[in-house]
Regions:
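Mature catalytic domains of secreted/periplasmic carbohydrate-active enzymes
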Residues: 1-248
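Extracellular Ig-like/FN3 beta-sandwich strand-entry sites
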Residues: 250-252
Length: 254
């Protein structure tokens, strides 16, 4: 660990697959080492007591449970000392420990679950529509998204994977970068008035998480053909909640 954390500059994230064996159970003093060498890195399932922790969401399919609160009643689920109760977090928890949804660009039935390369498996790369759905069920459910890319025998990400990763970014930007209307504010009710009836199938919600996660429940309604209809409802919003529902022609959203 000393070699890896000392020779490659500042690391954005350190991944502890399966967690960290605590000192009480015979493990090394990883906490002291990471605090000394990479104190600003994010640690996935890192040692208990480290402040920059994120937690697993329970699968490697980009499908976060909902709700998935960024706060929890303990800071890690895999150090042998503290255990988070379930995968949903706790809206009243004392620790900031957001979920991270990891998934691969290649399907789970490819070599080693899509985390490692094998020849002649380019056909197992997910389609852009499938990847967009994973984006909505990970980032759109208040979790960080980690996309696993394979490295081929030449030490490179294969061209097919590079192409699909770019297409993935393109479809995210196409879908979300130019919303029909944006609004922000305070209070118990916010509304968006559209100039004319408009077909809508997604609404993106976001809290200012500098103040924590304060919304515990919400409802979305729309005025459709002169009648109010409920579009969706939920609990956790956090940094991003993407509500995807059947297309409606709306003039006002609440």
């Amino acid at each position: 660990m000393t070699e890896l954390w000392s020779n490659y500059g500042k690391l954005f994230e350190i991944w502890f697959d399966g967690g960290v064996l605590s000192q009480q159970n015979g493990g090394a003093d990883i906490l002291t080492l990471i605090q000394r060498l990479q104190p600003n890195s994010i640690a996935f399932q890192g040692p208990y007591g480290y402040p920059n922790l994120i937690r697993w969401v329970g699968n490697e399919e980009g499908n976060s449970p909902y709700p998935c609160w960024a706060t929890a009643d303990a800071t890690t689920s895999a150090d042998g000392v503290q255990k988070i109760k379930g995968l949903y977090g706790n809206p009243h928890g004392n620790y900031w420990c957001p979920g991270e949804a990891d998934f691969t660009l290649r399907r789970n039935d490819s070599f080693q679950g899509g985390w490692f390369w094998r020849a002649n498996e380019d056909h197992l790369i997910f389609s852009t529509d499938e990847l967009l759905l994973k984006y909505e069920t990970s980032v759109g459910r208040n979790t960080n998204m980690l996309l696993g890319l394979v490295i081929d025998k030449n030490g490179l990400v294969p061209d097919a994977d590079v192409k699909r990763a770019k297409e993935f970014g393109d479809i995210i930007r196409k879908t979300f970068s130019k919303p029909i209307r944006k609004i922000s504010g305070k209070g118990y009710e916010l509304s968006i008035r559209l100039n004319k009836e408009t077909n809508i199938s997604r609404i993106v919600l976001s809290e200012d998480i500098a103040f924590g996660e304060r919304v515990l429940k919400y409802k979305l309604k729309g005025l459709c053909n002169g009648k109010w209809i409920q579009l969706s409802e939920g609990s956790c919003i956090g940094h991003k909640r993407i509500e995807h529902f059947p297309t409606h022609s709306l003039s006002v959203c609440l």
